[in-house]
């Protein structure tokens, strides 16, 4: 593998480590429930469940439609900035569960864009057995990211539950790595038939 592709992988794997950023609230779900005792526990659990996942799916559909006009690198970076800002917003806006759920929804949009575009970058630059190998390592970095985000979140949230969301500021490091290392990616051909 040449140096250029190794550089691309550094950017792709940096993005992969942030895909599980939606797990930041996992260690503090009980504390969030205690902070909003009048809210249904199922609603509290939505900060890590259905809301960010559904929004991620929506973002994947939209980003694949934009792939003929917007580079995959830009999609990844914009998605990642959205995740960071939405997550960090809970440090300020945490007076109601609705605010936390709204932040989770916006994070889901960003995460969907990041995942879809990084998967597509792998397809653009790696083929055959090399692609299978790269995807296997990619999955490892996604899992490693999940471990890191939950560990950092648990430490930060030990005093106040919403302090866990400061973990999203760590993403600045990954965004810089992506900006330096990610390739633009190939624009997808415009589709004549609308899949919707």
Feature-to-residue mapping (PLM):
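Conserved MFS/SLC helix-loop-helix module at the cytosolic interface between two early adjacent transmembrane helices
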Residues: 57-94
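Cytoplasmic helix-loop-helix junction between adjacent transmembrane helices
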Residues: 105-141
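Pair of pore-lining "gating" transmembrane helices in MFS-fold secondary transporters
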Residues: 2-27, 195-196
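Residue-level signature of mid-helix packing/kink "hotspots" within the transmembrane helices
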Residues: 23, 51-61, 146-147
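Helix-loop-helix hairpin linking two adjacent transmembrane segments in secondary transporters
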Residues: 137-182
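Paired small-residue
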Residues: 98-106
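Extracellular/periplasmic helix-loop-helix junction of adjacent transmembrane segments
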Residues: 28-57
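Small-residue-rich transmembrane alpha-helices and their cytosolic helix-loop interfaces
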Residues: 15, 52, 130, 135-143, ...
């Amino acid at each position: 593998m040449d140096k250029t592709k190794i550089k691309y992988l550094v950017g792709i794997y940096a993005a992969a480590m942030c895909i599980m950023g939606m797990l930041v609230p996992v260690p503090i779900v009980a504390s969030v429930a205690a902070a909003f005792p009048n809210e249904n526990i199922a609603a509290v659990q939505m900060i890590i469940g259905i809301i960010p996942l559904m929004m991620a799916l929506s973002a994947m559909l939209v980003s694949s439609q934009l792939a003929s006009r917007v580079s995959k690198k830009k999609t990844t970076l914009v998605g990642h900035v959205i995740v960071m800002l939405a997550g960090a917003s809970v440090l300020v806006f945490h007076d109601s569960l609705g605010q936390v759920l709204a932040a989770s929804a916006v994070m889901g949009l960003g995460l969907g864009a990041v995942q879809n575009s990084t998967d597509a970058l792998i397809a653009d630059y790696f083929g055959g057995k090399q692609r299978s190998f790269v995807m296997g390592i990619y999955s490892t970095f996604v899992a490693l990211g999940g471990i890191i985000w939950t560990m950092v979140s648990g430490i930060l949230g030990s005093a106040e539950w919403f302090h866990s969301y400061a973990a999203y500021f760590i993403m600045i490091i990954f965004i810089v790595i992506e900006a330096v290392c990610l390739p633009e990616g190939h624009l997808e051909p415009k589709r004549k038939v609308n899949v919707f």
